[in-house]
Design a protein with these regions (language model features):
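A short, structured active-site edge motif that brings together acidic residues
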Residues: 2-11
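A residue-level signal for conserved active-site and pocket-lining positions in enzyme catalytic cores
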Residues: 1, 60
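Binuclear metal-dependent hydrolase catalytic cores centered on His/Asp/Glu-rich metal-binding motifs
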Residues: 21-57
Length: 160
């Protein structure tokens, strides 16, 4: 198990009155670094998150960019986006997210959006187990993985 985070900085949180509303995933981050800087990340914007991820060897991936009230972020400041968000109770408009990834040459990932037992399953299938956070980032950057379905989203595994 490797450290990661789902974050909505103050500028994109659902608790403000007006859009944009966005959630981002930070993948492959060292837990101590996240603990050190985590609160300050809530006060930054997407570009700041992206630069922080680059400086700390992590990836910034937008979660479900087309779900309900969400809108895609600036692709210039993303490493990737969820091309397949497999939450069983939301329509994440995965086909639009897949096109967004392809059009902007972003890494398309998959995730179960596992917040409770109903959501288990799905994600990505890597060619081998990563050794550490840096290796996880390298494997995802290589794009040599399959997005796997879940029991709620019956589909074959696929690659972007």
């Amino acid at each position: 198990v490797f450290c990661g985070a789902e974050i909505s900085p103050d500028c994109t949180t659902y608790y403000k009155d007006n859009p944009p509303y966005r959630e981002f995933l930070i993948l492959g981050i060292n837990p101590e670094v996240l603990h050190r800087d985590g609160l300050s990340l809530l006060k930054t914007d997407q570009r700041g998150l992206f630069e922080w991820c680059n400086a700390n060897g992590a990836l910034l991936v937008q979660a479900h960019p087309y779900r309900e009230i969400c809108t895609p972020g600036d692709p210039e400041y993303l490493h990737g986006a969820e091309a397949a968000n497999l939450h069983p109770l939301h329509n994440s408009k995965n086909s639009k997210a897949l096109r967004f990834c392809k059009h902007n040459n972003l890494i398309g990932t998959g995730g179960s959006d596992f917040h409770f037992p109903l959501g288990i399953g799905g994600g990505i299938l890597l060619p081998r187990a990563p050794k550490d956070e840096a290796d996880l980032v390298a494997l995802i950057k290589s794009r040599d993985f399959e997005i796997i379905g879940s029991r709620w989203h019956a589909r074959k595994n696929y690659r972007l």
